[in-house]
UniProtKB/Swiss-Prot annotation:
It is found in: Nucleus, Nucleolus. Residues 64-84 are annotated as: Disordered. The keyword Nucleus applies. A motif (Nuclear localization signal 2) lies at residues 51-58. The lineage of its organism: Eukaryota, Fungi, Dikarya, Ascomycota, Saccharomycotina. Keywords: Nucleus, Ribonucleoprotein, Ribosome biogenesis, rRNA processing. One of its GO terms (biological process) is maturation of LSU-rRNA from tricistronic rRNA transcript (SSU-rRNA, 5.8S rRNA, LSU-rRNA). Belongs to the eukaryotic ribosomal protein eS8 family. Ribosome biogenesis protein NSA2 subfamily. A motif (Nuclear localization signal 1) lies at residues 15-22. This is Ribosome biogenesis protein NSA2. InterPro entries: NSA2_fam (IPR039411), Ribosomal_Se8/biogenesis_NSA2 (IPR022309). The keyword Ribonucleoprotein applies. Component of the pre-66S ribosomal particle. Interacts with NOP7 and RRP1. Interacts with RSA4 (via WD repeats).
Length: 261
């Protein structure tokens, strides 16, 4: 089945334009001027949003540069003043190069990079069209308005979820199609447990479906695994863990998932 990779396939078969690199270089060079022009010309709400976005980008860049500098920094700590007293064993290496901070920073960076890289059981799934996902709901006195949509797939909503007023609710999530628990299988132990769902981490179809909590095949969900008695290396009980849905919940009427360990 195609996975919307026709552009990559075409590049592999026929290659790129001969002037691709030059065009890309020029486009990137022009981008700076476009950003500067937007920063000067945008006013009102758009200007505020743009400034907020730029500020967040600059903060992230500063943090990244600082973390990079810390990982490279290998300075020796200040030696203790010599009072003629013998130093204890654990203070003898104070004058040597201190690499603890550099190692700690590099470990943190690697953890951040690997945070969302799971070897999931289902790396590819079938694409779902909007016509299949949403059903048009006619409203109004003469049923002439069609701005409402009803989700036809199973969804997850939190404990304190409250529907919006009827005249303001654009997307309806039917109560009959809401799921609170999932049949989660542990791949190493080979046991299946009925666990409560804590949230939807990522729906492969679209970020909007993730926000709406739509449960389709391949969706990464977070489940409560406290019943399994799993503990960390530090001895703390693991509360939530990610799992991937392996079935079609709207066809089976239940959610089956495999725990990502």
């Amino acid at each position: 089945m195609p996975q919307n990779d026709y552009i990559e396939r075409h590049i592999k078969q026929h290659g790129r334009r001969l002037d691709y690199e030059e065009r890309k270089r020029k486009r990137e060079a022009r981008e700076v001027h476009k950003v500067a022009e937007k920063a000067q010309k945008l006013t009102g709400w758009k200007g505020k949003q743009f400034a907020k976005k730029r500020y967040a980008e600059k903060v992230a860049m500063r943090k990244k540069i600082k973390a990079h500098e810390q990982s490279k920094a290998k300075g020796s700590s200040k030696p203790l003043a010599d009072n003629g007293e013998a130093l204890p064993t654990y203070l003898l290496d104070r004058e040597q190069t201190n690499t603890a901070k550099a190692i700690s920073s590099s470990i943190k960076q690697k953890r951040l990079e690997k945070a969302d890289k799971f070897s999931v059981p289902l790396p590819k799934v079938r694409g779902i069209s909007e016509e299949e996902m949403f059903k048009v709901v006619k409203t109004g006195k003469s049923k002439s308005k069609s701005w409402k949509r009803m989700i036809t797939k199973h969804t997850f909503v939190g404990e304190g979820f409250t529907r919006r007023p009827v005249k303001m609710e654009r997307i309806i999530r039917p109560s009959a199609l809401r799921q609170k628990k999932a049949n989660v299988t542990h791949p190493e132990l080979g046991v299946t447990v009925f666990l409560p769902i804590l949230g939807v981490k990522k729906n492969p179809q679209s970020p909007m479906y993730t926000q709406l909590g739509v449960l389709t095949k391949g969706t990464i969900i977070e489940v409560n695994v406290s019943e399994l008695g799993m503990v960390t290396s530090g001895g703390k009980v693991v509360w939530g863990k990610y799992a991937q849905i392996t079935n079609e919940p709207d066809r089976d009427g239940c959610v089956n998932a495999i725990l990502l360990v």
